[in-house]
């Protein structure tokens, strides 16, 4: 028996929600270990549709949810999400949800700075959601963050807000934005504290007890490897480490507890917002993929950019993310296409290169090298066994395995939870 860590292997929106939901039914605890409420996913359980941004997916399956220290939490957004899913009949209480006492908090000032800086960038925007995630992580690294445990100590909160506002109000004033008062932030946090503090726990200890008891832990990543602050397409990335190694750091367990690493990838590529995208399609095919795949962001509602599967980037994600196997999603979106292309390499200034460059200037000049494969006419939609797949679809999956140097462990053939082909059980050693 093994733990499982789920991460995105592209730029996010790969269908992690469905896969995590499928795995959560077999886990005992589901842990969020990085990110904030800037990414979301939709889960369909019976007649109910849940849209989650902060809450661990396992809650919809009656499993304990844990928010680790690597997450940044907007307490107001958290409580709003709890209220929303509770109104749908889902139990979210201190019995079912625990939050690390040392988790950094997102305050209204963080969102204000996020939006003011993005506006000041003009046409050089990063593509932030404006929800304060980046500034909250900056405060954590700069050692001025307000953490969940601080809400229990008003005297600590008082002087920490002084230190925080000394920095942030200077920035806001320089950007021509409205500044904040300590009294306003103190009142904001004091009002939220009684509802949030009951969820506080020593999460590293809780998870260690679970490990010793042999309980199955599912670590749920947000965003994806190519949005990792170190290994992604910097600076068009998120503000945290999204690779599997951070499941340990972001929850307080040892690295050996990460277990089987399952990378999620679509059978094609998408990206939201700004940043390089070598295999992006600007033609009718790109629009076709977007329409068939219903490619709109769960949180932002922004249409996603679409393109062919980029095997080079996914192979990089496999290597730096420590991926043991892939879950390939949305294969059915490719049904009926006469031919399918896969990016198998890059060209930079007339020379073939082995990997995607780190320099933004070089990234902008990269051109994809494609391999063309025959499509299939029969549908893969709803297939639940390998034998149900068209021969060309099987060839496509096998070719992806060869190119990314990782086996396809799970195959998703529709948004429905049970339309999943299992080749290997990630929870079994």
From Swiss-Prot:
Q: How is the cofactor bound?
A: Binds 1 Mg(2+) ion per subunit.
The record lists IMP as bound by 13-16, 38-41, 129, 143, 223, 238, 302
Q: Where does GTP bind?
A: 12-18, 40-42, 304, 330-332, 412-414
The residues that the entry says bind substrate are: 298-304
- EC numbers on record: 6.3.4.4
Highest taxon in the source lineage: Bacteria
* Compartment annotation: Cytoplasm
Biological pathway: Purine metabolism; AMP biosynthesis via de novo pathway; AMP from IMP: step 1/2
Which SMART domains does the entry mention?
Adenylsucc_synt
Query: What keywords does the record list, in alphabetical order?
Result: Cytoplasm, GTP-binding, Ligase, Magnesium, Metal-binding, Nucleotide-binding, Purine biosynthesis
Catalyzed reactions per annotation: IMP + L-aspartate + GTP = N(6)-(1,2-dicarboxyethyl)-AMP + GDP + phosphate + 2 H(+)
GO MF term set: adenylosuccinate synthase activity; GTP binding; magnesium ion binding
Per UniProt, where does Mg(2+) bind? 13, 40
Question: Which pairs of Cys residues are joined through disulfide bonds in the record?
Answer: none
> Where along the chain is the active site annotated?
13, 41
Q: List the Pfam families.
A: Adenylsucc_synt
Q: Main site of residence?
A: cytoplasm
Task: Provide one Gene Ontology cellular component.
Answer: cytoplasm
> What does the record give as cofactor?
Mg(2+)
PANTHER family referenced in this protein's UniProt entry, alphabetically: ADENYLOSUCCINATE SYNTHETASE (PTHR11846:SF0)
Q: Which family does it belong to?
A: Belongs to the adenylosuccinate synthetase family.
Q: How does it assemble?
A: Homodimer.
What's this chain's function? Plays an important role in the de novo pathway of purine nucleotide biosynthesis. Catalyzes the first committed step in the biosynthesis of AMP from IMP.
Which protein, by its recorded name, is this? Adenylosuccinate synthetase
Q: Which organism is it from?
A: Gluconacetobacter diazotrophicus (strain ATCC 49037 / DSM 5601 / CCUG 37298 / CIP 103539 / LMG 7603 / PAl5)
- Highest lineage ranks of the organism? Bacteria, Pseudomonadati, Pseudomonadota, Alphaproteobacteria, Acetobacterales
């Amino acid at each position: 028996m093994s733990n499982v860590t789920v991460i995105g292997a592209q730029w996010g929106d790969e269908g992690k929600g469905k896969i995590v939901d499928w795995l959560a039914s077999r886990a005992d605890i589901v842990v969020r270990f990085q990110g904030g409420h800037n990414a979301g996913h939709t889960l369909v359980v019976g007649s109910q549709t849940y849209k989650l941004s902060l809450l661990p997916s396992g809650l919809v399956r009656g499993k304990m949810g844990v928010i680790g220290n690597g997450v940044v939490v907007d307490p107001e957004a958290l409580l709003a999400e709890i209220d929303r899913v509770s109104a749908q009949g889902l139990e979210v209480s201190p019995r079912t949800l625990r939050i690390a006492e040392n988790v950094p908090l997102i305050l209204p000032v963080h969102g204000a700075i996020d939006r003011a800086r993005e506006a000041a960038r003009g046409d050089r925007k990063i593509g932030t959601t404006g929800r304060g995630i980046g500034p909250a992580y900056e405060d954590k690294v700069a050692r001025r963050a307000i953490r969940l445990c601080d809400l229990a100590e008003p005297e600590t909160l008082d002087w920490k807000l002084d230190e925080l506002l000394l920095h942030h109000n200077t920035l806001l004033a320089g950007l021509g934005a409205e500044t904040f008062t300590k009294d306003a932030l103190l009142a904001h946090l004091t009002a939220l504290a009684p509802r949030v503090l009951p969820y506080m726990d020593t999460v590293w200890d809780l998870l260690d007890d679970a490990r010793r008891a042999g309980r199955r832990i599912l670590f749920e990543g947000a965003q994806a490897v190519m949005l990792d602050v170190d290994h992604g397409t910097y600076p068009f990335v998120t503000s945290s480490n999204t690779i599997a190694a951070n499941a340990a750091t972001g929850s307080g367990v040892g690295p050996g507890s990460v277990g089987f690493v399952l990378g999620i990838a679509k059978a094609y590529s998408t990206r939201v917002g700004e940043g390089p995208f070598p295999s992006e399609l600007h033609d009718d095919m790109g629009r076709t993929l977007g329409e068939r795949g219903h490619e709109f962001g769960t949180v932002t509602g922004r249409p996603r950019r679409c393109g062919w599967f980029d095997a080079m980037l996914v192979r990089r994600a496999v290597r730096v993310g420590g991926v043991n196997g892939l879950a390939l999603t949305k294969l059915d979106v490719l049904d009926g296409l006469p031919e399918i292309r896969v990016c198998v390499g890059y060209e930079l200034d007339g020379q073939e290169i082995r990997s995607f460059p780190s320099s933004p200037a070089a990234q902008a000049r990269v051109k994809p090298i494609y391999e063309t494969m025959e499509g299939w006419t029969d549908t893969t939609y709803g297939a639940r066994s390998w034998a149900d797949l068209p021969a060309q679809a099987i060839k496509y999956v096998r070719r992806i395995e060869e190119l990314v140097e990782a086996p396809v462990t799970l195959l998703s053939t529709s948004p429905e939870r049970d339309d999943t082909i299992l080749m290997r059980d990630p929870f079994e050693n």
